[in-house]
Amino acid sequence: MLIYDSWNNDYKSPFGAVKRDESIRFTIKLSKDTKLDFAPVLVVFRTGFKERFLSMTQIDETDDCYVYSTIFSAKYSGVHYYYFSYTSNGTRFFIKKKDGHIGHINEGDLFQLTVHSNHYETPDFLKGGIMYQIFPDRFCKSGKLHQNIPSGRVIRDDWGGVPYYKPDENGHVWNNDYFGGDLEGIRSKLGYLSDLGVTCIYLNPIFESHENHRYNTADYMKVDPLLGTNEDFKKLCEDAKEYGISIILDGVFSHTGADSVYFNKFSRYDSIGAYNSKESPYYPWYTFYNYPNEYEAWWGIDTLPNVVETNPDYTKFICGDGGVLDYWIEQGAAGFRLDVADELPDQFLEDLNKCVKKHGKEKIVIGEVWEDASNKESYGVKRRYLLGHQLDSVMNYPFREAIISYIKGGNPNDFVLPVMTILENYPKPTIDVLMNFVSTHDIERAINHFGGENCDGKSKDWMAGRKLTEEQYAKGKNMLKSAFALMFFIAGVPSIYYGDEAGMQGYKDPFNRVCYMWGDEDNELIEFTRELGKIRKSSSAFKQGEMRFIYTDNDIMGFIRHGEDEDMLVFVNRSEHNRNIDSFLSMINDYSISVALRGLITDTGLNISAYDYAVVKCIK
């Protein structure tokens, strides 16, 4: 007998996170053999607060069980935890979570209930859209001659070459080789991106910095000269808008570069930096242990001195009127992806959110969080990312891990459980704009992960320039197609890492950041990606539709997205064999019209090709 299931509306309604003051019905079933001393109770609490006990009332009975229920609403936003308790023959019993969502007696963990602000809204422009991530130096080189290039840079003339990675005699990797990709190059490819269905471009850092990754900001108010000018960025945003594409910038606000206007360790700038004098206006932004050479730095990397985000002058510089955020949004940015969000204090995130949102609810804030962001703890603090006052969305690493694991042959439940856990823990406004991906600049490209050798523990010499064999590439490509199908149709927004759609390869940083191989693309894979985009945009169900799993076996993952006027049934085949789902016809009995947008409906079921997917539009 099923005692409780937090994923089942018969036991908890509504499913998942709720608004503050929203009523939730909890229901449990207890065997008639259980002799209760008094009515069972629901116990709810927030960390650091007292437990709240709610008596449950019997509302029904069956041949073998009694059904108890109660209604709860939370007065405060925050992550709540709950369990059920009852006493029988003087002994107290607990019903807790096991197997991710099932109630068990006297074993398991607490259930989670996320309660968010009842004013929490996220931008509509990203819902139902497609994101495309670009590492600016490596996407497209316009050939435009740029002025005022800072000293110390190695300008490469071998587009597509292996990035420099070897340390010097002192063990330092300079990251100072540049291939010349620029904003004008990106602008020239807007038509290509539009054809892919892209509605949002996420740019890795573009501000002046003296390493090619540009995560060591030198000047927050200036586009790096090798990428172009501030006016070039404004023009890119204007032209992108004509294609229905928005631009999101990478905001690196937990640290600056040591070689910067603000720290100025190498006296490159005319400013008096924090390193130059304790009288510098920037000195309070940093934490020095033994001035000037010993200071707090991100992960101890001395080229990345940490800032004190709560310093009023720094907060004002970033979030104040006329500050960094205001300036770039006024130039055309649709929002920011926040690097290392775990390093940013709650108050700073709330100030940042307020600043971005004063430009309108369509501006977005996305955080880099690698774990479940609803219950994340960093530096001993329970974070409040998704309660309505900090982040709209996060980079969805849990989904990425689930997709990769499943496509490589993992147990179907190892995909279903993490996906459903996120859907249960995250607010619906967050889910609608979740950034879903299989590759980024911080991890190896998915095609390598699927088709290549395991690179964990391998040296950079081993990774450098290493290409997949034809057999490895074919395997990786097939698995990537199945992964893309999951990424495009599960809840949230698919994010393509530049070149993945064209078969680009690369193991770990910096080899996952090589130049886009224009003229040598895998056009069949590009067309496959275009088709995914067209189907995704064909139905509002993929925009904000609730998601539920409806079919799993060792090779097929099936789920439904519920729309207002139609439902979309999606089935992804991860195997090398064509498959037929015999039970499919019974799934569509209640629909008046069922049309296969991909796949083939026959008298015996639904046919799906190897490493492919099927999408069926169903209308009641």
Predicted regions: what is each one?
Residues I28, I134, L193, L203, ...:
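Conserved, mostly hydrophobic/aromatic
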Residues F135-C200, I206-Q331, L352-K358:
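Substrate-binding/active-site clefts of carbohydrate-active enzymes
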Residues F15, I550-S586:
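Carbohydrate-binding surface patches
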Residues M1-G129:
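Glycan-association/targeting regions that enable binding to alpha-glucans and other polysaccharides
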Residues D137, Y379-G380, M435-L468, F484-D522:
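Aromatic/acidic polysaccharide-binding cleft in carbohydrate-active enzymes
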Residues L36-T47, H80-Y82, N578-R598:
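Beta-strand-rich binding/interaction modules
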Residues K32, D603-K620:
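C-terminal beta-strand-rich structural cap/linker in extracellular carbohydrate-active enzymes
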